[in-house]
C-alpha cells in the first residue's frame, strides 16, 4: 500500500533530496506537456512535502508558484543533515525561483514558530516574493480532516489562500 511504502521510506531515513527533485521535475514536465497546459506550473506540499516544495522552488527553474504548508525541516541543524538530505533547504533561499506562499500553525513543533520566523527573515533579506500566514490555534497538519490535528477554521482559510495564490500566479 502507499502507507507501507511511505513507512519504509521514513524508516530508511527519508527520500534522498536528489531523487525527490528528479521526481518533481518529471511531474512538472508531464503537466507542461499536456495539451491543456497554459505553460505555467506550481508545486505544493505539506510537512516533508512542504520541505520538498520549497527545495524544488529553489533548485528547479520550472515552477511559477510554490506553496509550503508547515514545511518541516526547511531549517535543519547540522546534526540533522544526512547523506540523503545533505543541505538544509534554507541554505538555498537566495536561489528561490518563484513566489512562495507559506501556511503555518503556531502550535506546530516542526517547524517551530522560531523556525518560521527565521525562514521568513531569510526570504525577506533575499528580497523574495513571499506571503506567510500563521494560524494561532493550529498545529502540524491542520489540513488533515481525518486526523485529530485537523483545525477546520484554519484549514478552510488556508485552502482559500492557496487557491487564490495559485489563481493569481498561474493564470
Short names for language-model regions:
Residues 1-171:
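N-terminal cap/leader regions of alpha/beta-hydrolase-fold enzymes
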Amino acid at each position: 500500500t502507499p502507507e507501507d511504502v511511505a513507512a519504509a521510506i521514513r524508516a530508511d531515513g527519508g527520500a534522498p533530496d536528489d531523487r525527490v527533485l528528479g521526481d518533481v521535475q518529471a511531474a512538472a514536465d508531464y503537466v507542461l506537456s499536456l495539451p491543456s497546459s497554459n505553460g505555467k506550473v506550481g508545486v505544493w506540499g505539506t510537512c516533508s512535502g512542504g520541505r520538498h516544495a520549497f527545495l524544488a522552488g529553489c533548485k528547479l527553474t520550472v515552477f511559477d508558484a510554490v506553496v509550503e504548508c508547515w514545511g518541516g525541516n526547511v531549517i535543519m541543524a547540522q546534526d540533522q543533515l544526512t547523506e540523503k538530505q545533505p543541505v538544509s533547504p534554507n541554505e538555498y533561499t537566495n536561489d528561490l525561483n518563484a513566489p512562495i506562499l507559506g501556511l503555518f500553525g503556531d502550535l506546530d513543533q516542526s517547524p517551530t514558530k522560531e523556525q518560521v520566523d527565521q525562514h521568513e527573515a531569510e526570504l525577506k533579506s533575499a528580497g523574495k516574493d513571499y506571503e506567510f500566514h500563521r494560524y494561532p490555534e493550529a498545529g502540524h497538519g491542520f489540513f488533515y480532516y481525518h486526523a485529530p490535528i485537523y483545525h477546520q477554521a484554519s484549514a478552510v482559510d488556508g485552502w482559500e489562500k492557496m487557491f487564490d495564490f495559485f489563481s493569481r500566479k498561474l493564470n
